[in-house]
């Protein structure tokens, strides 16, 4: 099989490439250049998409004795990931750019080019598993990345390979060291690669500008003025521009955002409880949409826990009734529906959250 391996320069994709070589495949490595000005992406040993990462990926390819290329996807990345990220915050949403990158860049633009060039599959260093065409959680639950892959269609998954999903991260590092790969001890990346400072509010403010609005309490009383709804997300406690706790002495959190009026509503922790979720643009990873109701578990954050729920689908809307409330769920987040399975929880569907309601 002719396999293109997306090599980020990190330990996971490096071991993924090595395993593909060991399996006897015809392997080519590729690193994605995602910025026209690489200095705007994270530099140094921590992060991804930096010039240093490209060099690390090339050195691993040399050790593995495989061809290696750098492909420029900067324009697509800006349009489909960065611009989408900014626009989502303008709408008062909280997007996940890693989800969008997998959907639009790695498994669409990159995979599409790979197939056009005659490759049979795209392999990545994601912690996830595929069995019988079904996407499942990784063996290493702490590193599982099925959440950020749940937007992939059955057609996209048909050409995907996840070589390390059956192995704990600690063993991946040990294997890299045994293979003599210099990235064996390279730190993991955690933050958004195109915000090197880690200051999301400043990044958005520089692109959106000042759009003043009011911070109000549950009764509509104005408490403060802000410079744009893009500086807030549901559940946020710090940086609200208000003095002290609420009248009850308890902390106040962002409980609602109305981008049309520029209003940010704050309230108590209990106002963040959510019992019902609705999602748009559903994707059914097996290719078959379920009707419902389906007993399941739902995850609403990349590193969040699983919550018991009942899901149903009708007319392009995915609806979830929770058995117990989730706290601080925002529009724009991705919700992923899992079916519990001893062989590895199966991803049934995903959707972009459009509604999160209390009782």
Curated annotation (Swiss-Prot):
One of its GO terms (molecular function) is ATP binding. It catalyses: S-sulfanyl-L-cysteinyl-[protein] + uridine(34) in tRNA + AH2 + ATP = 2-thiouridine(34) in tRNA + L-cysteinyl-[protein] + A + AMP + diphosphate + H(+). It is found in: Cytoplasm. InterPro entries: MnmA-like, MnmA-like_C, MnmA-like_central, MnmA-like_central_sf, Rossmann-like_a/b/a_fold. Disulfide bonds join 101-193. The record marks 126, 333 as: Interaction with tRNA. Catalyzes the 2-thiolation of uridine at the wobble position (U34) of tRNA, leading to the formation of s(2)U34. PANTHER family: MITOCHONDRIAL TRNA-SPECIFIC 2-THIOURIDYLASE 1 (PTHR11933:SF5), TRNA 5-METHYLAMINOMETHYL-2-THIOURIDYLATE -METHYLTRANSFERASE (PTHR11933). This is tRNA-specific 2-thiouridylase MnmA. The lineage of its organism: Bacteria, Bacillati, Actinomycetota, Actinomycetes, Mycobacteriales. The gene is mnmA.
